[in-house]
């Protein structure tokens, strides 16, 4: 995994160790904004699991973009059961993410970018029609 030799442990936590919940994440978003002098957009990446709740929480933390990766996406680290057998398919996740942004009143302020399982132009058209920005 990630080109490590056999016998070497890979640490790949499910979340960044700097935050335990939404309050910490909100502080980290503000910290990054200040560190970059507000010159770069802040993007939060989410795996599609508890889509509605996770997108609502992330949106309230103040990012410019929420990047949603459907179950068809992957990671460079993690056990097979987590990388291949869990998550919500992208096409099912997009409407939930869009609804969450609308419910917190931020659908016009936060771009929803999606990935994972997009195979062709028809899939791109479906994603856009379901509410993704890109």
What are these regions (language model features)?
Residues 1-7:
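Flexible glycine-/small-residue-enriched beta->alpha junction loops
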Residues 2, 14-17:
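Flexible, active-site-adjacent loop/turn segments at secondary-structure boundaries
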Residues 7-15:
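Short glycine/proline- and acidic residue-enriched helix-loop micro-motifs
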Residues 16-134:
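Glycine-rich phosphate/ribose-binding loops and adjacent secondary-structure elements
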């Amino acid at each position: 995994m990630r080109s490590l030799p056999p016998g070497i442990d890979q640490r790949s936590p499910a979340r960044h160790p700097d935050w335990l919940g939404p309050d910490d994440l909100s502080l980290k978003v503000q910290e990054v904004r200040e560190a970059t002098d507000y010159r770069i957009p802040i993007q939060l990446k989410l795996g599609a699991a508890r889509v509605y709740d996770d997108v609502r929480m992330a949106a309230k933390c103040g990012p410019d973009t929420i990047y949603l990766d459907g179950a068809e996406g992957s990671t460079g680290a993690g056990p097979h059961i987590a990388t291949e057998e869990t998550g919500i398919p992208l096409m099912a996740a997009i409407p939930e993410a869009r609804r969450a942004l609308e419910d917190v009143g931020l659908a016009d302020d936060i771009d929803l970018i999606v990935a994972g399982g997009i195979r062709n132009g028809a899939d791109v058209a479906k994603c856009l029609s379901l509410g993704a920005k890109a």
